[in-house]
Design a protein with these regions (language model features):
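Helical element adjacent to the flavin cofactor pocket in flavoenzyme catalytic cores
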Residues: 93-150, 154-164
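Dinucleotide-binding Rossmann-like beta1-alpha1 core, especially the glycine-rich loop
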Residues: 8-91
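Glycine-rich FAD pyrophosphate-binding loop
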Residues: 1-5
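Short, solvent-exposed loop/turn segments at the edges of secondary structure
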Residues: 6, 10, 197-199
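A short catalytic or substrate-binding loop motif that flags glycine-/basic-rich loops and adjacent residues
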Residues: 43, 133, 195-198, 207
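Short hydrophobic/aromatic beta-strand or adjacent loop that forms the aromatic wall/cage
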Residues: 48, 92, 178-180, 199-201
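Central helical "cap/lid" subdomain
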Residues: 144-196, 207
């Protein structure tokens, strides 16, 4: 959840993956599942606009339309000039995609976990050592030691730190810095999300409910 929260808390429908139909289709499937399971934390009342840049984009408007049709996700043409200066984007599309309020979802999960007597959450702890002890995995973090038959590595960008402790080969991950700015917009953009594809461009999304 932290990774998605940092990445604008977007509930992906698949539009970000015009060069991977399988990823887009999986995203659309999980989009429906997330909306069904966690609809209480969603922000849905805004226009989600995707556009393809006329310059330096790996995907043009025609390709984006074909991709959306193949993935069976919404893609309604709107005039690019409604949102952009003339000549900047060769296609602009109204789509279906939402954001979620991570604080609302976090509170819900904490309430669910608090009801489980065998769950303990440790904050501000990093594992010092991970080792296999017979049929269980033993994780040591300072003075705390826990054992479990399975480990789930959900560290996202820190996945290779855990791999190193386990003696596993690292994933070939490329890290990129990204600036996320919280700002107040005027009324023209208050109920609009805009994402320019497909390259080193920008995205503007509503944040929270």
């Amino acid at each position: 959840m932290r990774a998605t929260y940092i990445n604008q808390a977007r509930v992906h429908m698949g539009y970000h993956y015009p060069r991977s139909y399988s990823t887009a289709i999986k995203s659309a499937h999980y989009f429906e599942r997330f909306c069904r399971d966690y609809g209480f934390c969603l922000h849905t009342e805004f226009d989600q606009v995707y556009a393809t840049s006329a310059h330096f984009s790996w995907t043009n408007a025609a390709e984006f339309r074909r991709f959306c049709a193949a993935a069976e996700i919404r893609c309604d043409d709107v005039p690019p000039e409604k949102y952009f200066n003339p000549g900047l984007c060769d296609g602009t599309f109204l789509t279906t995609e939402y954001t979620y309020d991570a604080q609302v979802l976090k509170r819900w999960f904490l309430e669910q976990l608090a009801a489980l007597p065998n769950v303990e959450i440790l904050y501000s702890r990093k594992p010092d050592r991970i080792e296999q002890a017979g049929s269980v995995w033993r994780v040591t973090a300072g003075e705390y030691t826990a054992e479990a038959p399975y480990l789930l590595n959900a560290t996202y960008a820190g996945v290779n730190d855990i791999h190193a402790m386990l003696g596993l080969p690292p994933f070939g991950i490329k890290y990129e810095k990204c600036e996320i700015i919280l700002c107040t917009v005027d009324e023209k953009l208050r109920n609009t999300g805009i994402t320019v594809m497909d390259g080193p461009f920008f995205s503007l999304m509503p944040f929270g409910q």
